[in-house]
């Protein structure tokens, strides 16, 4: 699991553990075991309601936090721009860490101003509590909007991708923009 993809001097491991639908002691145990067997990328989100268990699993593993690439996401369906900083700080507290490697916009909505949201998230990055900003479930239109708004340094786009959903047009756009594809299935 040593292969990784790098951008802006930050490497993301090629295989990660997604924690969607993991809860309670099972989540904590799975995260700990994954790290013990060599996983170094753990993906969670406030929407998954398991950040506390993920954080405990990381602590329980004994793996140095600097060796773990940790991703979480801002839930744009419930958090509006004025609540992003508080939501992020709650995620840090739940995860028992003072930074995350990657912060994503989770499930974009059109009721939120994308430019304002990215501006706030990049402000969090400036505080060094986040190493990279990315997006999740963005289509080509939304990626183009990021560029139009001046946010050309999006680290990655986490999207559903598998043999039954190839996303070739989206992957081509991401390649043109030098945005790392992160797949879930």
Residue ranges and their predicted role:
Residues 1-4, 52-59, 87-90, 140-143, ...:
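Alpha-helical scaffolding within the catalytic cores
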Residues 1-68:
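N-terminal binding-site loop/beta-alpha segment at the start of enzyme catalytic domains
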């Amino acid at each position: 699991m040593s292969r990784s993809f790098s951008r802006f001097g930050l490497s993301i491991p090629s295989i990660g553990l997604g924690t969607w639908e993991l809860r309670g002691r099972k989540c904590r145990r799975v995260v700990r075991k994954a790290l013990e067997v060599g996983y170094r990328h753990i993906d969670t989100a406030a929407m998954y309601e398991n950040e506390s268990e993920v954080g405990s699993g990381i602590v329980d593993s004994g793996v140095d936090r600097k060796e773990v690439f940790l991703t979480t996401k801002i839930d744009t369906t419930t958090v509006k721009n004025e609540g992003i900083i508080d939501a992020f700080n709650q995620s840090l507290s739940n995860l028992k860490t003072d930074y995350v490697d990657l912060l994503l916009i989770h499930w974009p909505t059109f009721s939120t101003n994308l430019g304002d949201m990215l501006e706030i998230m990049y402000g969090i990055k400036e505080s060094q509590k986040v190493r990279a900003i990315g997006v999740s479930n963005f289509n080509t239109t939304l990626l183009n909007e990021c560029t139009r708004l001046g946010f050309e340094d999006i680290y990655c786009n986490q999207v559903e991708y598998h043999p039954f959903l190839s996303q070739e047009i989206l992957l081509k756009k991401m390649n043109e923009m030098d945005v790392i594809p992160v797949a879930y299935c």
